[in-house]
Amino acid sequence: RIYLLHSTLNDYLEQLLCLLYENMMNDAQTGNITGHNTIASALTNIVTGKEDANFSSPNGKYNFFTCSSNTLKCDEYAFNASSILIAGNGEFNVKHYTGKFNAYQRTYVLIPDLEYYALLYLASMYQIKSFKSAASGSIVKFITKGDIENIPVFIPDNKAILNKFNCLLMLQEQYQKESDELASIRDWLLPML
């Protein structure tokens, strides 16, 4: 039950983040808030993971992000930061994670200053959704580094907005870590019944 509660809370937080982001973007378009436009490459370096899919290990200690929506495990980490992960092919999903992890070679890793962490995650998520819907009916094989570098990002002058986004995203990550720990304990205990 606690696991389901955490999952429900995470879904709710994701919806809340999206709603607040859409509201901010609407306010920006109507002139109700001020700020400036930039692109992802102005906020962070963009790199890819170096590992192939065989790098995963079922009992690994660290998360291994691939182009799948499912997160695998591995034995070695290459990154240790609050990061945005964008699948360069396959499902074209966008994830966020704070901690030690590794990434597949077609997964883009963005590590912005913490001030812009949630904002860049939301901008990336909406741009990738837009990219997928614009390509509807045609085959999109991959997303390029240039596509990622040019993700548009609106930065509001009111820093309280950024703080709100970051607090909600960090809360979501905390619930996810607790859910993962509970699932691990459940999986360890079930065979003992």
Where do the PLM segments sit?
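Non-catalytic DNA-recognition/assembly elements of restriction-modification systems
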Residues: 1-68, 157-193
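DNA target-recognition domains and sequence-specific DNA-contacting regions of bacterial/archaeal
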Residues: 35-156
